[in-house]
Amino acid sequence: MSGRLNLFIFSCFILTFSFSAGAQTLSLKAAVDTALANYGTVKAKGNYANASLATIQQAKRDYLPNFSLSAQQDYGTINGQNGPSYGLGGLGTASSGPALDKQNWNAAFGALYLANVNWDFFTFGRIKQRIKVAEATYQRDNKDYEQEKFQQEIRVSSAYLNLLAAQRLTRSQEKNLQRAITFKNTAVIRASNGLIAGVDSSLAKAEVSSAKIALTKARDVEQEQANRLGILMGVTATDFKVDTASISRIPSNMLNDTTIAQTHPVLLYYKNRVAVSNEQLSYYKRLYFPTFSLFGVMQGRGSGFKASYITDQHAYTSNYADGVNPVRGNYLIGIGMTWNLTTILRNRPQVRSQQYISQGLTNEYEQVNQQLQAQLALAEAKLKNAIDNYLEAPIQVKAASDAYIQKSTLYKNGLTTIVDLTQALFTLNRAETDRDIAYTNVWQALLLKSAALGDYNLFIKEF
């Protein structure tokens, strides 16, 4: 399957964190709307669809007859010569005159005015089929536009959730730093009073440095996440202020659906690719047949050479007005057929080629459908696991918090070692980190399932 679809399938869980932008409160819906309005790929797909729509009008107008007007005014000689000739490569002249016994350089003006109509009125459905190809191409490009918007919604939502998680992790590391500072201050005071060994204060200072480094790393991840979100939104930003409390609950609708909709944007796009190929195949088959045409010509012609010039070579005038004035006219109407029989032989390989293309596109459609089925099964499992972790996380945090408070109290009273307190601090920080990740993973799993089902509204209506 294409790399684009792979990104679509797994983007929900890939933590591609991004850089930061000017502080602003940003909701998920606002982020998605901004991305759809600004992102270059989405806008490009929309323009491609509009171009295909214009092509339909062009295909319909191909049925109109050709109507040509022509006018030319010339000056030259009209010496004739008996003998055959061919305008090879379009080279030759159209001077007509008597074949005299010797060359002369008598010259006059001449003119030709022409109106021509040519209409291929019956082509065994080629024109209509060309319109169908254009319409199918528009449907394909429009579905490509729709599926690009759908994938962009998924990508932006995933990046937004990652930013929420990153900001929650940053807050947890800030709390961890405050606990480490409090712990260090207590250790320094007790060590200065001789109540504990001096090494305890050194270990406490090391814990503070470790907490600061962890906080810096968390902020770096948050900045990367903000940058990633800004890129997807098509804006330049250094910081986004988001509502981290919005993922502190589980979704009200856990999406019990287990059937992928036939209106899935990605499936519709691949289905329309097959439709375009089939319409193109039908068009190629119609090239086997002849073309019936109606045509009509109206002609006016002027010349500075008189009708008696064949016997009197002085019967001409070099006057411009006399030469370009049309004094003779003709008309012609008719019906004709053209059929290039070798087209039958030439087009057969092209028809076979297009048949293989249709089969290949059908294979791709089936593969995408299988991938979406697998994604749906994966999303079901991830959603169940994420909910289990969500329910377990508060228990872990409560137990770790109680243990830290207990060890902190015991340490202040000299009843436990700094190693035990450090371990309790580490356990609490890990529990808070696990909680933040567990909360986010529930929503990421819901987003993954919504993406597999092909209905983004199932996810976004929760916000």
Where are these regions (language model features)?
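A small-residue-enriched
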Residues: 35-122, 262-343, 374
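Acidic, low-complexity, intrinsically disordered peripheral segments
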Residues: 68, 77, 434-463
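Bacterial Sec-dependent N-terminal signal peptides
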Residues: 1-40, 458-463
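Sec/SRP-type N-terminal targeting helices
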Residues: 43-47, 60, 107, 121-149, ...
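Periplasmic alpha-helical coiled-coil/stalk elements that build and connect Gram-negative outer-membrane
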Residues: 7, 151-265, 275, 428
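Amphipathic alpha-helical coiled-coil/helical-bundle segments that mediate oligomerization/assembly
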Residues: 163, 201, 218, 383, ...
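A short glycine-centered flexible hinge/capping loop motif at secondary-structure junctions
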Residues: 191-195, 411-415, 452
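Short terminal targeting/anchoring segments
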Residues: 199, 413-437
